[in-house]
Amino acid sequence: MNLHEYQAKSLLAGMGMPCPKEIAIQQISQLADVWQHIACPSKGAVLKAQVHAGGRGKAGGVKVLKQLPEAQAFVQQMLGSQLVTYQTGSEGQYVSSILLCENIYPVRQELYFGMVVDRESQRVTFIVSPEGGVEIEKVAHETPEKISSVSIDPLTGVQPCHIREMFAVLQLEHGLFAAFSRLVNQAWKAFNELDFALLEINPLVLRETGEFMCADAKVSLDDNALYRHPELQVLRDETQEDPRESQAAKLDLNYVSLDGNIGCMVNGAGLAMATMDIIKLYGEQPANFLDVGGGATQERVSEAFRLIVSDSKVKAILVNIFGGIVRCDMIARAIIHALNEARITLPVVVRLSGNNAAEGQRLLAESGLTVEAVDSLDDAAKRIIALLN
């Protein structure tokens, strides 16, 4: 579960990490009072549109403003709008709040500081770079030598040697070691106690006073651990999530909306990826990733079809099922039920393979529905594209 910047920094500040003075507003009527508390007469304040996406600055969603009338115009423009960045897609994301931050610039240095769960090593990895304030992907591509990662065994936790290694990479003055060490330990505590899946502070700034400050923060919480944190569950902002993805999560379906026009329903994440790949291989684009899982039932298949056809971009549907534990004849009956129930008129091609595949294909052929059953994934992809065109 992703958090807004102001929510992330509130959690970090609660763990003792240094964050700027800031207040989030949801209505323009709140602006004048908040401006009095946050803005500096000479430097104004930083106003940031709150969305779950990067690239806000380049999209016009972050401004340093010195006068209240300028801030009022910005808030009026942003609140209730759709902010489009390189990470949001063409539809953008809804702006329901604006964060007013004290202007802490100029600063001595901007750093990158991140933490992520490394599933391969089953450890938490710190990622640091002296090049902060820019997209870390750009740094990784252009100057990878400026990024360093330090893997931490969860059984031992952060040790002084780990902190010294990061400190050396950041090329900081010796007198800053105690403050940096304190920051690392606070971040480790927050990451573990609050079950973060990702923490990104970009930039972590070093002020002229020698003080570290989290100028921006991104936090993703581990969905599987949310049951331990009811106080964090209320931080979810469903306006930032695709409605179909939210509905799929409630139904325990793995769904990701994409930009194409061929809806996909598959059992198994790997098979779903292969299905999308072959659609792209033959020149079309998938409209979604949808894994109904190994425990597919008639109800889950029906819900999956409803999700797919709720997307107006979908012009055809490809179903790819490999029957193992799940029998293909059961899936075929579920497909027939779903197509009848939802009155789906779009072209549908079904590839069944494995357990009771022949029986499943017979049921589809005798259903009287305009659904085509094929044996191979290659044939399925070619046929659905032919029907689409």
Where are the predicted features?
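ATP-dependent carboxylate/acyl-activation modules
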Residues: 1-201, 205-319, 353-354, 358-365, ...
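Short internal beta-strands
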Residues: 321, 345-354
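Hydrophobic alpha-helical segments
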Residues: 311, 342-345
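Cofactor-cradling patches in redox/metallo enzymes
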Residues: 311, 320-330
